[in-house]
Amino acid sequence: MSIENTLPTYQSLALALNQQAVALTPAEMHGLISGMLCGGSKDDGWRALVHDLTNEGIAFSQALGLPLQQLHEATQEALENEGFMFQLLIPEGEEVTVFDRADALSGWVNHFLLGLGMLQPKLAQVKDEVGEAIDDLRNIAQLGYDEDEDQEELAQSLEEVIEYVRVAAILCHIEFTQEKPTAPEIRKPTLH
């Protein structure tokens, strides 16, 4: 299965957000929508929640609504793809510094946790691998850096953290969106 819906570019989404005076970066908006999808959002209720959290409950104009719909659809498709196609929307390119990417990652993770927490209010009670991943995400959201650090080393470490965050998001999606068997569906061994 190929990913038919593609994410809007970071720059085009930044422009649309700025034009609508929404004080989120594209990374933060993608993190928020990703968190809601990973938390189990399955209907159009995501729009109202995004409006409430980012625009005082007021719906966006079509100029921003359409790119956000595209962002939502592409993200949902990537999360549901068995090939683990999901990627974080973080700025890239020659003009983007490693510090810009680190800041964007922090914003993405913070908003991912916000979106996830809105749909999974008992997040603190989650155990096992998923609980550990959520705890790690909380720590990653607070990571800082020293601008005197070796940028090449920081860039390599950042790529490893981005990959960890990507896998943690997929793990949350699996945990909170896959149907769990109900009691009658769990078969007990039959004694003959």
From Swiss-Prot:
Protein name: UPF0149 protein YE3397
Family: Belongs to the UPF0149 family.
Pfam families the UniProt entry points to: UPF0149
InterPro entries: YgfB-like, YgfB-like_sf
Alphabetized PANTHER family for the sequence: UPF0149 PROTEIN YGFB
Organism: Yersinia enterocolitica serotype O:8 / biotype 1B (strain NCTC 13174 / 8081)
Domain of life according to the entry: Bacteria
Gene Ontology CC terms: cytosol
